[in-house]
Amino acid sequence: MYVVLEGVDGAGKSTQVGLLKDRFKNALVTKEPGGTRMGEHLRHIALNENISELARAFLFLSDRAEHIESVIKPALKEKKLIISDRSLISGMAYSQFSSLELNLLATQSVLPDKIILLLIDKEGLKQRLSHKSLDKIENQGTEKLLTIQQKLKTHAHALKEQFGCEVLELDAQKSVWDLHRQIVAFIECVV
């Protein structure tokens, strides 16, 4: 089963992924972008080089293609639980070029079975961002991140409608352990 955690920076994805790694010891825990060695190089170029937005989008698509081919598909073949910090959903939400068709090509139509969306309101986001050093995206402000969050929701629900991916939306401001319990129950509930 392929499970992805989605949410804007500061929503608590990394915290939950860490807890899930401890809970599901045999799971493959990965991330996007940068879930492969090549992906780390592509991510570095995409985030640090002065390149066009279109070139940046294609670097992230290349990273996604390599990640699916070398990490996700082999783990699915072995029937492993896969837990990924981000996926094509973030790729489409953060990019100016959010083509589902190109992402389906990059993923070879390998899509998550379950999508966990950690959603946060403006005040909660401001509070969390005030406690950390901000990266390039976070420095664009809470309004930009809230716009991205809406795109995350839109893309996740589009995958649900078109491909049957299950979606769980959670209030990221709830306690870490309440969220963890709900996420574990969602993962363990195999219909």
From Swiss-Prot:
HAMAP family: Thymidylate_kinase. Its EC number is 2.7.4.9. The gene is tmk. It catalyses: dTMP + ATP = dTDP + ADP. Keywords: ATP-binding, Kinase, Nucleotide biosynthesis, Nucleotide-binding, Transferase. Belongs to the thymidylate kinase family. It comes from Helicobacter pylori (strain Shi470). Pfam families: Thymidylate_kin. Phosphorylation of dTMP to form dTDP in both de novo and salvage pathways of dTTP synthesis. It comes from the Bacteria. ATP binds at G7, V8, D9, G10, A11, G12, K13, S14. GO terms for cellular component: cytosol. GO terms for molecular function: ATP binding; dTMP kinase activity. GO terms for biological process: dTDP biosynthetic process; dTTP biosynthetic process; dUDP biosynthetic process. PROSITE patterns: THYMIDYLATE_KINASE. This is Thymidylate kinase.
